[in-house]
Amino acid sequence: MERPEPELIRQSWRAVSRSPLEHGTVLFARLFALEPDLLPLFQYNCRQFSSPEDCLSSPEFLDHIRKVMLVIDAAVTNVEDLSSLEEYLASLGRKHRAVGVKLSSFSTVGESLLYMLEKCLGPAFTPATRAAWSQLYGAVVQAMSRGWDSE
């Protein structure tokens, strides 16, 4: 896999990182629209959410969105040396596997990430920017998937 174009990633992330919760909510709303079976995996204090809107307005889930956006921020910060995040990302993979997330769902997360970036950036979300983010996300998922394979 080619290395992502660092400057395209950083430049586009600057716009997103100004409002991470807002943009992260767009990402997860899209994720639940594409893969509604993921909604039951999100439970806090034994509370089952009745709808994506219910989940997306929950303070506990908003905290999860913040954490996801911090992981993306770490990947952007380390875009030229993602190996420095290898152990952390593999451990995230293990955690996601333990709660029942399927590895195949990360493809839908990637689609949702690209959707959010396109909505945030508008015309600045060029084909080159899309390709750079696809490469970065692919590398992150590759590292996380190692968590599925290890105990």
Curated annotation (Swiss-Prot):
Tell me, what does this protein do in biology? Answer: Monomeric globin with a bis-histidyl six-coordinate heme-iron atom through which it can bind dioxygen, carbon monoxide and nitric oxide. Could help transport oxygen and increase its availability to the metabolically active neuronal tissues, though its low quantity in tissues as well as its high affinity for dioxygen, which may limit its oxygen-releasing ability, argue against it. The ferrous/deoxygenated form exhibits a nitrite reductase activity and it could produce nitric oxide which in turn inhibits cellular respiration in response to hypoxia.
Q: Describe the reaction catalysed, as an equation.
A: Fe(III)-heme b-[protein] + nitric oxide + H2O = Fe(II)-heme b-[protein] + nitrite + 2 H(+)
Q: What's the family?
A: Belongs to the globin family.
Provenance organism = Macaca mulatta (Rhesus macaque)
- Keyword Phosphoprotein belongs to the record: no
For this entry, the protein name equals: Neuroglobin
Q: What class of enzyme is it?
A: oxidoreductase
Which terms does the record give in the GO molecular function aspect?
GDP-dissociation inhibitor activity; heme binding; metal ion binding; nitrite reductase activity; oxygen binding; oxygen carrier activity
Question: Where is this protein localized, as stated in its record?
Answer: Cytoplasm, Cytosol; Mitochondrion matrix
Q: Taxonomically, which superkingdom?
A: Eukaryota
Positions that bind heme b: 64, 96
A biological process (GO) annotation for this entry?
A: cellular response to hypoxia
